[in-house]
Amino acid sequence: FHFASPASPIDYLKIPIQTLKVGSLGIHNCLGLAKAKNARVLIASTSEVYGDPTVHPQTEDYWGNVNPIGLRACYDEGKRAAETLFRDYHKQNNVKIKIVRIFNTYGPKMHPNDGRVVSNFI
């Protein structure tokens, strides 16, 4: 499983380079290990890969509308790059993959001023 990435806008806006590296280099390392060990791997992606959708509701094959140089691009594009690497490792190396796009999570250790939609509503 690969769930590593800052998800709070407050956090990832402070460390954009590290956030993007998790989505690219971290994923590359994870997939390389899965290939070497013939392991299955699942990544937790995000609804942010859709960006600001121009289509409602979005279908599974919707490509998204992400601003590649916007404030949140380090997170959005990192997740998009991660999904691309997953697909490419599957196609090129037959690594067994699963991609899940998780929307609006909340948990007991989430900071109340996290900056995500659920904590903002609460």
Regions found by a protein language model. Give the residues of each.
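Substrate-binding strand-loop-helix patch
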Residues: 22, 108-119
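N-terminal Rossmann-like NAD(P)+-binding domain of SDR-like oxidoreductases, especially those catalyzing
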Residues: 1-108
